[in-house]
Amino acid sequence: MKRTYQPKNRRRKRVHGFLKRMRTPGGRNVIKRRRLKGRKRLTA
């Protein structure tokens, strides 16, 4: 059986990227919380 994680940069950006996060209210909350927490990286 093959492993389930087969990394692809395009999918990574499309699914977890900044623009995708900004599209939904929940995603904006994620960005906001990560800013407040002081994360170096906000999104993938």
UniProtKB/Swiss-Prot annotation:
Residues 1-44 are annotated as: Disordered. One of its GO terms (cellular component) is ribosome. It holds the Pfam family Ribosomal_L34. Gene3D superfamilies: 1.10.287.3980. Keywords: Ribonucleoprotein, Ribosomal protein. InterPro entries: Ribosomal_bL34, Ribosomal_bL34_CS. Residues 1-23, 30-44 have a biased composition (Basic residues). One of its GO terms (molecular function) is structural constituent of ribosome. The keyword Cytoplasm does not apply. GO terms for biological process: translation. Belongs to the bacterial ribosomal protein bL34 family. HAMAP family: Ribosomal_bL34. This is Large ribosomal subunit protein bL34. It comes from Carboxydothermus hydrogenoformans (strain ATCC BAA-161 / DSM 6008 / Z-2901).
